[in-house]
C-alpha cells in the first residue's frame, strides 16, 4: 500500500514537473535566429571608468595589443559607481603613447596596427557625473557624440559597445537619438549596436534595456555596488581566488608572478601594465570574443568562445529577454559549461565558459607582448589552419546524416615558424541556440590532423522527458584546436557546425 502510494506521488510529481517545464519553455522567448555574418574587422567602442582601480588599465593594454584585430572607433573615459565625479582620458592617452613606442616592432609581426596619433584622436570623455542624472536633453558629451557618429556611418558591420564602467554615455547618446529623430531612424540605429556590459556599474543599463527593447545586450544584470559580481560570467577571466567561484580552474597564468615574467618586463607597453588589486582584467571579456581566432563567438553569444557563452532569456526583474546567464538546468537549456578541471574532475559553471580557454588566451597575450620587443625570427606566431580545403577562420557548415561519417581534414594546416603542431578535435556540447536540438556526435582520430565525425543522434537526450519531441534535425558544434610547440605555445581554432538530419529511410535510397 505504501509502495503504491509513493508510486502515485512520483507520477503526480513528474507529471506536474513536466507540465511546469512545458509552460516554462513555452513562455521563454526563443533565441534570435540572426547570425552576424560580415567581412572585415569588428567595429569597437570602449566605455571605461579607467582610473578608479588597476584592472581597466590592464584591459586597455591588452586592447592596444590587439588593436590590429579591430576597427576601434572610440575610447570613452566614463564614470561608474566606483568613480562618480571624474573621468580620466589622460590615462588612455598615456597608454597610447607607450603603445606608440612599440608599434614599429609590432608591425614586424602583423599588419593593421593603427598609429598612436590615430588612436589618440579617438579618445573622448563622457559626462564627469554619475548615471542617468548626468543625461538630459540639454547635455551632450564628446563621448556620446562619438557613439552617434559611429552609428551613423554607412557600414554594414555591427558596432560593438564594450562597457567597462557605467553605461550613462550610451544612455546619453540614445536619449539624444530619441529626442531628435523619427522612430524608424532610431530603430535603424539601434539595430547596428551590440552591447557587452561588464555587469551594471551605474543606473543607466537597466533604463537602456527597458527603453530600447530591440537593442542587442549582453549582461548579467546586477546591483550597482558589486555584491553580485561573483555570479557573473566575466569573472571567469581571473576571479577564481578573489570571488571563490573558479573550482577546477588553473590559476597559474593569472597571478602577479606570471604577469611579472610574461607581461610587465616586456618593453614600454608592458611597463604600463599594473599589478592587480582585486582581479586581473575584469573588463577584457567584453572584447576577448571579438578576436579572430577561429571560434567566431562574436557571430552569436550562444556559440561560446574566449569572451564566454550566453543564452537568450528574460532574467527576473528585466522587462524583456537579453543575452545573459541562467536557464533551466533540468532541460539543459543553460548558460553553463561543463569542463574538466585541473584535478581531472568535471565542473559546471558560467565562469567555466571563459576559464576553459584561459591557458590559450594568456599564452596569446604573452606572445603578443613579446612582439613589442622581438623580431619575427625570435618570436612565436599562431598556426594557420585549413579544414577540408578551406583556409581562414570562418565557420564551416556541413550537412550531415545520422550514421554517416563526415571526414574532417586539417592536414594542410601549417605553422608560420615551422613548429610541430598538435591537434584536438572535440564537440562543444553546450554551444548553439538554447531552443534548438543538439545532436550527438562521435569523433575518431581526435588527436590527429584528420578526424571522422559520425552523428549518432539528431537530438541529445534530456534529463527528463522533453515536452516537445525531437523532430529529427539537430546541430553539433565541433571545435578544432591546433597548438604549436613554441614558447609560449599558441593555439588557433576552427569551428565546424554539423546540421544533423535523421537517417534516411531505406525506400529513399
Regions found by a protein language model. Give the residues of each.
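Extracellular interdomain linker/stem segments of modular secreted and single-pass surface proteins
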Residues: 499-507
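Short, solvent-exposed loop/turn segments at the edges of extracellular beta-sandwich modules
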Residues: 482-489
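Surface-exposed, flexible coil segments in extracellular/virion-facing regions
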Residues: 426-465
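Edge beta-strands of extracellular beta-sandwich domains
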Residues: 492-498
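Bacterial N-terminal signal peptides
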Residues: 8-24
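Exposed beta-strand face motif in extracellular beta-rich ectodomains
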Residues: 472-478
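N-terminal acidic, glycine/proline-rich low-complexity segments
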Residues: 28-407, 413-439
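N-terminal secretory signal peptides that target proteins for export/translocation
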Residues: 1-6
Amino acid at each position: 500500500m505504501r509502495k503504491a502510494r509513493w508510486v502515485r506521488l512520483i507520477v503526480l510529481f513528474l507529471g506536474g514537473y513536466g507540465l511546469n517545464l512545458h509552460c516554462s519553455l513555452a513562455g521563454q522567448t526563443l533565441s534570435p535566429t540572426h547570425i552576424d555574418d560580415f567581412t572585415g574587422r569588428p567595429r569597437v567602442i570602449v566605455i571605461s571608468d579607467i582610473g578608479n582601480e588597476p584592472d581597466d588599465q590592464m584591459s586597455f593594454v591588452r586592447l592596444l595589443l590587439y588593436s590590429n584585430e579591430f576597427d576601434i572607433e572610440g575610447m570613452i573615459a566614463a564614470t561608474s559607481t566606483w568613480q562618480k565625479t571624474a573621468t580620466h582620458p589622460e590615462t588612455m592617452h598615456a597608454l597610447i603613447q607607450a603603445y606608440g613606442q612599440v608599434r614599429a616592432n609590432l608591425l614586424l609581426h602583423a599588419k593593421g596596427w593603427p598609429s598612436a596619433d590615430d588612436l589618440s584622436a579617438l579618445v573622448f570623455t563622457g559626462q564627469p557625473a554619475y548615471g542617468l542624472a548626468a543625461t538630459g536633453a540639454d547635455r551632450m558629451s564628446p563621448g556620446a557624440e562619438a557613439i552617434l557618429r559611429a552609428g551613423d556611418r554607412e557600414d554594414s558591420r555591427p558596432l560593438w559597445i564594450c562597457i567597462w564602467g557605467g553605461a550613462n554615455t550610451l544612455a546619453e547618446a540614445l536619449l539624444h537619438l530619441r529626442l531628435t529623430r523619427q522612430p524608424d531612424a532610431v530603430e535603424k540605429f539601434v539595430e547596428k549596436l551590440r552591447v557587452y556590459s561588464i555587469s551594471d556599474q551605474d543606473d543607466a543599463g537597466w533604463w537602456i534595456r527597458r527603453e530600447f527593447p530591440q537593442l542587442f545586450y549582453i549582461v548579467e544584470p546586477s546591483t550597482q555596488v558589486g555584491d553580485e559580481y561573483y555570479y557573473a560570467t566575466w569573472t571567469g577571466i581571473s576571479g577564481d581566488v578573489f570571488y571563490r567561484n573558479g573550482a577546477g580552474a588553473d590559476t597559474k597564468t593569472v597571478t602577479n608572478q606570471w604577469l611579472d615574467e610574461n607581461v610587465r618586463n616586456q618593453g614600454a607597453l608592458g611597463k604600463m601594465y599594473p599589478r592587480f588589486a582585486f582581479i586581473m582584467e575584469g573588463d577584457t571579456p567584453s572584447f576577448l570574443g571579438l578576436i579572430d581566432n577561429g571560434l567566431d563567438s562574436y557571430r552569436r553569444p550562444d556559440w561560446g568562445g574566449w569572451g564566454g557563452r550566453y543564452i537568450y532569456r528574460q532574467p527576473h526583474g528585466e522587462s524583456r529577454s537579453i543575452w545573459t546567464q541562467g536557464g533551466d538546468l533540468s532541460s539543459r537549456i543553460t548558460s553553463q559549461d561543463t569542463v574538466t578541471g585541473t584535478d581531472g574532475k568535471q565542473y559546471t559553471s558560467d565562469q567555466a565558459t571563459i576559464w576553459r580557454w584561459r591557458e590559450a588566451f594568456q599564452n596569446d597575450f604573452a606572445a603578443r607582448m613579446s612582439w613589442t620587443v622581438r623580431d619575427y625570427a625570435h618570436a612565436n606566431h599562431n598556426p594557420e589552419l585549413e579544414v577540408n580545403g578551406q583556409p581562414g577562420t570562418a565557420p564551416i557548415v556541413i550537412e550531415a546524416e545520422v550514421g554517416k561519417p563526415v571526414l574532417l581534414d586539417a592536414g594542410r594546416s601549417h605553422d608560420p615558424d615551422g613548429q610541430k603542431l598538435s591537434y584536438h578535435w572535440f564537440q562543444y556540447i553546450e554551444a548553439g541556440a538554447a531552443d534548438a536540438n543538439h545532436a550527438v556526435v562521435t569523433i575518431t582520430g581526435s588527436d590527429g590532423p584528420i578526424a571522422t565525425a559520425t552523428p549518432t543522434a539528431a537530438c541529445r537526450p534530456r534529463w527528463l522527458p522533453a515536452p516537445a519531441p525531437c523532430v529529427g534535425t539537430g546541430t553539433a558544434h565541433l571545435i578544432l584546436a591546433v597548438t604549436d610547440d613554441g614558447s609560449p605555445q599558441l593555439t588557433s581554432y576552427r569551428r565546424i557546425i554539423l546540421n544533423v538530419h535523421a537517417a534516411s529511410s531505406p525506400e529513399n535510397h
